[in-house]
Design a protein with these regions (language model features):
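Short beta-strand->loop
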Residues: 76-86, 173-186
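Secondary-structure junction motif
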Residues: 109-132, 201, 208, 218-219
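A late-sequence structural motif
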Residues: 25, 148, 177-221
C-alpha cells in the first residue's frame, strides 16, 4: 500500500488518457493546469480505457480519462461530458455531408482499430445495435492507432466511426466530413477517475477543477 510519497520524489502529476482525448481535450486542459501550477511536472500516458485502469491499479498513473463504467466501490468517478459518436469520411467521399440510411454505408470500406481493442468492441456494439456488422461493409482496414484512422479517412481510403470531439477541428477545417445517418444516435460518458481512497486525491481534484472550468468555458458546445 502506497501510504506516502518519498520525500525526494518529484512533484509529478501522472495522468492517463484515451489516446484521442489525450491529443485534444487532455492536452488543452493540461496547458491550463500548468498555467495555474507552473511548478508541476507532468507525465501523460495514453491508451485504451481497459489498459488505463490497469495502469491506475498498478500505480503507474494516479488518475485517468476513460470512456467506460467504473464501479463506485473501487473508483472515485466524475463525469466530464458526453461525447457523440459520428461517422466520418473525406470531403470527396460520395456520401460526404449527406443524410443516409445505415445500409447505404455498406458498399464502402470501413476503417477501425484492431480486433480486441476497446474501440473495436465499442464499434461492434454500435453496429449490432443497428442490425449491422463489420462484415456487412464491402471491405475494411484494421489499424493500430487513432491517428492512422484519421489519416486514412482524410486520404479517402474509407469511412470510420469516431468521437466527434476528437475530430471537431478537422471537421471545422474541412479536411474531414460527417456522414449523417437516419435515426442514429450514440453518446458515451467521458469520465475522470482515480482509485478510491487514493493518496493523490487532492492533486487529482486540482486537475478536475481545471477540467470543469475549461468545459464551462465551452458553453453548450456539442461534444
Amino acid at each position: 500500500n502506497r501510504l506516502s510519497v518519498p520525500i525526494n520524489e518529484p512533484d509529478v502529476f501522472k495522468l492517463g488518457s484515451l489516446t484521442g482525448f489525450g491529443e485534444t481535450f487532455a492536452a488543452k486542459v493540461m496547458g491550463k493546469y500548468l498555467d495555474k501550477y507552473p511548478e508541476k511536472k507532468v507525465s501523460i500516458y495514453m491508451g485504451e480505457s481497459d489498459d488505463l485502469l490497469v495502469q491506475l491499479a498498478n500505480g503507474r498513473i494516479q488518475a485517468c480519462i476513460v470512456d467506460t463504467y467504473c464501479p463506485p466501490e473501487e473508483y472515485e468517478c466524475h463525469e466530464l461530458f458526453e461525447s457523440e459518436t459520428i461517422c466520418i469520411c473525406a470531403p470527396t467521399h460520395p456520401l460526404a455531408g449527406k443524410t443516409v440510411d445505415f445500409k447505404e454505408l455498406n458498399p464502402y470500406r470501413l476503417i477501425f482499430r484492431e480486433e480486441g481493442s476497446k474501440s473495436y468492441l465499442n464499434l461492434r456494439s454500435i453496429l449490432h445495435g443497428y442490425n449491422q456488422d463489420i462484415h456487412n461493409f464491402a471491405s475494411f482496414v484494421e489499424v493500430g492507432t487513432i491517428n492512422t484512422i484519421h489519416n486514412l479517412v482524410i486520404e479517402n481510403v474509407g469511412l470510420s466511426f469516431v468521437y466527434k470531439f476528437v475530430v471537431q477541428k478537422k471537421l471545422d477545417r474541412g479536411v474531414m466530413s460527417q456522414i449523417f445517418i437516419n435515426d442514429f444516435k450514440n453518446k458515451t460518458f467521458i469520465n475522470y477517475v482515480w482509485m478510491k481512497n487514493s493518496f493523490f486525491a487532492e492533486k487529482n481534484r486540482e486537475f478536475l477543477d481545471i477540467c470543469k472550468h475549461y468545459l464551462s468555458s465551452l458553453g453548450d458546445l456539442n461534444l
